[in-house]
Amino acid sequence: MSNRFLHFVYIPFVGVGIRPFRGDDWFRARVEIFKKYTLNSLLNQSNRGFILWLSFTPEMRSNPVTLELEAYLREKKVMAFFTFNGLMYFDDKFNSGWKEKLINLARIVRMAYQDQNPQSVYNFKTFLKMILVNKPPLSFGWKQALTELFRGKNETLKERLTESLGHLKANLQTDQFDWVYVSRIDSDDMFHQDFVKEVQQFPPYPGALTCRKGYVYNSNTGQLATWEPTTNPPFHTIIFPKEYFFDPARYLQYFKGFRSHEDVP
């Protein structure tokens, strides 16, 4: 069996969960966090043998902040692919049942309130006031959030994968490898400096690697604490046979019904 592989570090930058795009101010601040923490943790890897893959929603393609980020990564000599078809895996915040949709609707309202009133306590009374009196959700993308919530985001996943994976395949020498490692991290998190090296020490096989323990860091106080969640956190590496990775139908089949990072074995 061949041990030749390609390693992506995948970062879903915009398009995760039930939040709409929060505006350029948020996006620019997020990029600065990414540069300071996430990107530096990748630049400091003891093994730099990986390719960065960042995914965004379609409207971010021509955003000046996106273009600035692309230029910055070129300046840092980081090989990176940008795709603009949203999230590249099943989003468990968009289940099809009505109960789940209503729960997510309540989450949207709560997070909108907390964004605009960070020092206030959110409860049912503030929820009613927000909806019936102030109606501030209109200012944070309420209509877009509802559209995303009820249209069935995951129903378009195969179509979105087709375009994004096609873009990757067209720009890679696919005869140079037989396996694809995809390590997921968010745009405000960090990897240990030996993460890539340790992942690549595992011979390719059809399966996944997970990070079960880690740390949480308070950037305001400099405090560091251990983090040991009871379920798998969203920092995992999926190891694909090449023929599965670049075929959207087989890509989805490969997950075998996984609907959340908590399902990754």
What residues fall within each predicted segment?
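Short beta-strand-to-loop acidic/aromatic patch adjacent to the donor-nucleotide binding site
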Residues: 177-190
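Short, acidic, metal-binding catalytic loop of nucleotide-sugar glycosyltransferases
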Residues: 37-49, 72
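Hydrophobic targeting segments
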Residues: 6-11, 22, 42, 50-55
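Hydrophobic/aromatic residue at the end of a short beta strand that borders the catalytic acidic motif
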Residues: 191-195
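Active-site-proximal specificity loops/subdomain of glycosyltransferases
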Residues: 64-180
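Conserved donor-nucleotide/metal-binding helix-loop-beta segment in metal-dependent transferases, i.e.
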Residues: 196-213
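Short beta-strand-to-loop element that shapes/binds the nucleotide-sugar donor at the catalytic cleft/hinge
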Residues: 209-223
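Short beta-strand/loop segment that forms part of the nucleotide-sugar
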Residues: 48-60, 82-87, 185
